[in-house]
């Protein structure tokens, strides 16, 4: 029984780990904000409980934004926290023409993220 629980937990961890497979570097995020006229950036931390809860539905929604969605792990990256004015994770920010136009901070419902993407697309 115990081995079965470990196997299930390991499988869930691997599925969540795969969500972050396409994450961006800080340089890629900086360049995308500067060069693209419209981009969403999801700031998260690997050890953030709230990020672990929302990532399974937030990331697939963001990936439907046709290349206008980037994922950045800011755990331990104080410069990114300050540069992008991140107060907490998860944080989803939309940039248009190099400037932040809106953000949603903290753990939110699937519907709230969906509405955010729809209103900012």
Q: Each predicted region: which residue ranges?
A:
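Thiol-based oxidoreductase modules, predominantly thioredoxin-like and allied folds used
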Residues: 43, 62, 66-79, 88
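Structural micro-motif
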Residues: 84-93
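A short beta-strand-turn-helix
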Residues: 20-37
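Non-catalytic, surface beta->alpha helical segment in thiol-disulfide oxidoreductase systems
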Residues: 93-121
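Short active-site neighborhood of thiol/selenol oxidoreductases, capturing the structured segment around
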Residues: 34-46
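N-terminal targeting signals for export/organelle localization
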Residues: 1-19
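The canonical Cys-X-X-Cys-His
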Residues: 48-51, 92
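Typically the conserved alpha-helix immediately C-terminal to a functionally engaged Cys/Sec
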Residues: 50-65
